[in-house]
Amino acid sequence: MQVSIVNEHKYRELEPLNEMLVKRGGVKMIPEPKFVISGLVDNEEYVIKLRIDLADEFRYSYQNQQWTPFAPSTKNSKLSAITETEHRKETGATWNMRIVQFDKLLITREFNDIQRNVIHVEPNHKYIPVLTIQNVTTGKSTEFQFQQMEFIAVKSYQSARIRHTKRAPRKMNLAPGSSQKPQLIVPDILHSPTYGFTAAPPPFPFEYWLLYPQIQYQIQQLAYSLPMGPPMVPIHHIQCTEASQRVYAPEYGWNSILMPGAHKEQDDHYMFHHEIWAPQDHELEKLHVLTEQKNKPSETPQ
């Protein structure tokens, strides 16, 4: 029977001593414990368990960029051995072909949070995971320990190198299943599928595909285009050539404001033409109307 660690290179990056962050409510272990087992009897049933034991009887402190023991361990430091997580029993042939991982395992620093798949660890103490393989058919159990999996439980990371190593993968949220090969996501970003004029169909409360099947089946775009026109031209892109006309009149000079009707500004928004007059234009227009009425010959009754 042989047992090996799957992600052993991650533990090598955290040497000489890993730090495991623990919080209230429980957090997952980083790296996650994963094992590969070989040499089990195919027709016999096994149960695989994992617990966390206290590595020694000391309490540690971080000084001069290293962990050193300074006091005996506390009473609650041994409570981790009372809880363990296990998989359901499977045949040896199944375990030989499977990666054994404990993704539901959580570690906490609060004794009240102890429950199934939640193990209590005391901060500033050294622990080591213990893998137990129990043969249900014969009743024998075998335990495995790996020194590179030892860790110090901490409330906050003390080593800057370990803090950077564990938080670096969280800088870019990758798609599920692509964390091992982030370069595979780049073609998807550069060449994202399009649905007509939109990058992606928005969510609708009704069945949107019944109205526009060409969004779901892109081949139908050849015969049935989407019922939407080209985008509206922005207003500031419309150039009005009649808005800056200046007319010279000898009696007024180049002052177009005093000339009634000589300088008109047009608003071409959405193809509607509106003449915009200045206040002087209105005053001159009124004066022009009054002058025309005064000079108009009066009609005398015959």
Swiss-Prot record:
Keywords: DNA-binding, Nucleus, Transcription, Transcription regulation. InterPro entries: p53-like_TF_DNA-bd_sf, T-box_DNA-bd, T-box_sf, TF_T-box. GO terms for biological process: cell fate specification; positive regulation of DNA-templated transcription; regulation of transcription by RNA polymerase II. One of its GO terms (cellular component) is chromatin. The keyword Protease does not apply. Residues 5-180 bind DNA. It holds the Pfam family T-box. This is Putative T-box protein 34. It comes from Caenorhabditis elegans. The lineage of its organism: Eukaryota, Metazoa, Ecdysozoa, Nematoda, Chromadorea. The gene is tbx-34.
